[in-house]
């Protein structure tokens, strides 16, 4: 008699945004089916690197990915989406699927400049809960200004889900552009959410993630 082995999800990474922490995914995870939680990782990006810059965060997180076997499902919001896209470009053989929430592929320089100004006016205590200083946050923001992944988008061959809150006017344009620039992308809007979809619509986000992962072809780990 043949015994079927249940399909095992690849390791899945949920990457938080700027101003968030790994706890920002808790409500989303609570709404996911049990089988999709088995190999789930929510790294605290700021704890993975001693150098708080874009490249420092990327390298610290990249090293944690290299410790995991097989292929990966990557899902990131905002800063996390940029990191996930960058990793997929640099390591296409490692990525099974990609979810980009409120993502950008080219830094919006004006918005980053405004954000830096706002950060500079905030008290240092506002950054303590993230485990970084005010100066480190400003340095991180400045380090992202030159970022531009536009030339590499056509090399991303894995299935991609682009998610954007229906009220997130800032990132909607980038999502529309990526829909046409990424070869295997689909796009959905999350009702009732703006930028921080994982905090503003966790149940709806969990449904979108679960449906996307369920729709993927089942493949064995590398």
Give the label of every model feature segment.
Residues 17-20, 78:
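Active-site glycine-rich loops that stabilize anionic/oxyanionic intermediates
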Residues 19-27:
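Serine-hydrolase catalytic-loop signature spanning alpha/beta hydrolases and amidase-signature enzymes
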Residues 26-30, 39-73, 207:
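Active-site loop/oxyanion-hole signature of alpha/beta-hydrolase fold enzymes
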Residues 54, 85, 89-90, 98-124, ...:
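Flexible "cap/lid" loop of the alpha/beta hydrolase fold
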Residues 76-80, 84:
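Gly/Ala-rich beta-loop-alpha elbow adjacent to hydrolase catalytic centers
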Residues 125-151, 167:
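Hydrophobic, aromatic-rich cap/lid helix
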Residues 155-156, 162-164:
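Short beta-strand/loop motif that positions the catalytic acidic residue
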Residues 193-202:
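Catalytic histidine-centered segment of alpha/beta-hydrolase-like enzymes
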């Amino acid at each position: 008699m043949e015994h079927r082995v249940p399909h095992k999800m690849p390791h899945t990474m949920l990457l938080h945004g700027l101003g968030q922490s790994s706890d920002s995914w808790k409500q989303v995870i609570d709404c996911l089916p049990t089988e999709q939680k088995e190999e789930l990782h929510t790294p605290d990006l700021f704890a993975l690197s001693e150098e708080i810059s874009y490249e420092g965060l990327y390298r610290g997180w990249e090293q944690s990915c290299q410790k995991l076997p097989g292929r990966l499902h990557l899902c990131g919001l905002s800063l996390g989406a940029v990191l996930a896209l960058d990793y997929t470009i640099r390591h296409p053989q490692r990525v099974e699927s990609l979810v980009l929430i409120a993502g950008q592929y080219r830094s919006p320089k004006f918005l980053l400049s405004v954000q830096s100004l706002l950060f500079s006016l905030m008290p240092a205590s506002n950054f303590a809960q993230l485990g970084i200083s005010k100066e480190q946050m400003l340095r991180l923001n400045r380090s992202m200004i030159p970022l531009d992944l536009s030339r590499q988008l056509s090399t991303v061959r894995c299935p991609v889900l682009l998610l954007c809150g229906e009220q997130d006017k800032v990132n909607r344009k980038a999502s529309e552009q990526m829909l046409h620039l990424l070869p295997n992308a689909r796009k959905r809007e999350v009702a009732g959410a703006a930028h921080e979809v994982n905090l503003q619509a966790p149940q709806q986000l969990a449904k979108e993630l679960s449906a996307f992962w369920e729709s993927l072809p089942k493949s064995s780990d590398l």
